[in-house]
């Protein structure tokens, strides 16, 4: 590995830079030096989600500015972070037989030279389906290498590989060898895009738009950088200052980024309790309130029993004592077959009786 390559790998990327900022930096450097390496492009853009238009536009800009894409001297086809020759399982991930067989199978497929890629691309332009399959098969290792970087984000390793393969197929269909860049460089963005979109769509209980996923990822990078610089968790105001966002927007993004937690999550060493057991139901009555309510019902029933049947039933309907639905004077009048004025008179008489100290004192303690 050359000294220049080591320098590229150790450079730190300002987490506050936008995709356009980084693309401009690359183009400015390419215009100055006349070339850019595939490895440097991959390193600089690795944290951004680029759609097909952005990818094609970027490579078009490189061509328009006569910037040549080259390999790092003495480097492999990709840097150490994306190594298609490494088909081992990601750290901490146990692979089952189907995955092991798949990795073994794609490991038998020979990688392509730059000239072979061009020859296949020419045949693909002519509609050769066999050439499409050959180019895709030769880059399945690349998908595995990229998929490893997304393990632990809510999707199984094999699912990540399958989504990445879909991105690889799109890259095969859209690759334009005449622009001068390697297929692996171009395919990397398609593979990453397919995987990140799948994570946004499938891995979260609540779906987050892809553009918001990129914003969340950027915020997390800024948050981690500030944590290192400050030695403490940064405040929303500090994050907002770095990202040029108001604190309210930062709080909103942080809230969106939170993952839902199941109420069935086991709690304790014995896993005999669940998270939901320790969360208060704000709508449920406390035992003391429930006891007081039941006692009030008993006292109210006793007081109503001192009225005539008609007076009691009128109050029950007017105040919804039985079903919680209050009725108008007219509605109650229809029930008893009398006028609304007559119901008003019965209600007034019944309430006067309830206000008598002999009855009201029994309910007075419940008025607080």
Curated annotation (Swiss-Prot):
Q: Where in the cell is it found?
A: Cytoplasm
GO-annotated cellular components: cytoplasm
Q: Which PANTHER family match?
A: RNA POLYMERASE SIGMA FACTOR RPO, RNA POLYMERASE SIGMA FACTOR RPOD
Looking up Pfam families in the UniProt record yields: Sigma70_r1_1, Sigma70_r1_2, Sigma70_r2, Sigma70_r3, Sigma70_r4
Name this protein carries in UniProt: RNA polymerase sigma factor SigA
User: Which keywords label this protein?
Assistant: Cytoplasm, DNA-binding, Sigma factor, Transcription, Transcription regulation
- Compositionally skewed regions (Basic and acidic residues) per UniProt: 71-83
Task: Report if keyword Transcription regulation is assigned.
Answer: yes
Whom does it interact with, and what assembly results? Interacts transiently with the RNA polymerase catalytic core.
Q: Identify the DNA-binding region of this protein by residue numbers.
A: 329-348
Renumbered residue ranges of the record's region Disordered: 71-90
